């Protein structure tokens, strides 16, 4: 990873510590997880990682508090629940309303979080993130999720006057593990569908 100059997402104190010890450039590290500890957030901020993905209003307050204690500004993205049902089965779908990851667009939580980040002295809004699941065949779910996130970005810009510097669209392209699985969609096909 380091030799190739790739970025890495981490989701625990152990993963973050390992990435840093392995020499991954902190500007290429993201911190995910819907139950981040103070220790994880503190290490992320002290190391100067690229961004922390916010999953709840509690995390908005938690990250603001820790950043204020350290005298730094935390780079954050808001993870959205787009309502998309995608993925090979319900256990790996990550964007519908009953999932523990992200803030709901449907209930207004996501908008509330972005507004709170805008008003926070120690948070720097870096954009919006969505991850719709894994083992996704076809392009439709990716395109629909992108439309939903872009529409929300326009609302954030229009109603809050806040630029949305980045949109991070996640989801795992399906893999044919068995002969019965459909032919996988290539990342190129997904990119083409998103470009139209």
Locations of the language-model features?
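C-terminal active-site-proximal or functional interface alpha/beta core segments in diverse enzymes
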Residues: 134-196
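N-terminal active-site wall of soluble small-molecule enzyme domains
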Residues: 1-49, 88
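Structured alpha-helical segments in the cores of large, soluble enzyme domains
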Residues: 19, 82, 106-125, 149-164, ...
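Conserved, mostly hydrophobic/aromatic
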Residues: 1, 12, 44, 63, ...
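Glycine-rich tight-turn/loop motif centered on a GG-T
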Residues: 46-51, 90-105, 138-143, 178-188
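Acidic (Asp/Glu)-rich catalytic clusters
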Residues: 1-3, 19-26, 45-46, 67-71, ...
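Structural preference for beta-strand elements that scaffold enzyme active sites
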Residues: 7-8, 26-30, 51, 73-79, ...
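Conserved anion-binding
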Residues: 56-124
């Amino acid at each position: 990873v380091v030799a190739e100059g790739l970025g890495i997402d981490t989701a625990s104190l152990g993963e973050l510590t390992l990435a840093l010890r392995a020499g991954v450039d902190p500007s290429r590290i993201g911190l995910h997880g819907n139950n981040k500890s103070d220790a994880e957030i503190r290490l992320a901020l002290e190391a100067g990682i690229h961004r922390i993905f916010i999953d709840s209003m509690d995390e908005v307050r938690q990250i603001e508090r820790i950043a204020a204690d350290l005298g730094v500004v935390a780079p954050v993205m808001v993870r959205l629940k787009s309502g998309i049902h995608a993925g090979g089965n319900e256990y790996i779908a990550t964007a519908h309303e009953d999932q523990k990851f992200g803030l709901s667009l449907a209930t207004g939580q996501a908008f509330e979080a972005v507004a709170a980040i805008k008003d926070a002295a120690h948070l720097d809004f870096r954009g919006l993130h969505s991850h719709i699941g894994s083992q996704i065949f076809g392009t439709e779910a990716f395109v629909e999720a992108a439309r939903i996130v872009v529409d929300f970005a326009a609302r954030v810009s229009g109603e809050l006057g806040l630029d949305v510097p980045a949109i991070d669209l996640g989801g795992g392209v399906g893999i044919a593990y068995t002969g019965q699985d459909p032919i996988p969609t290539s990342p190129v096909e997904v990119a083409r569908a998103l470009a139209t």
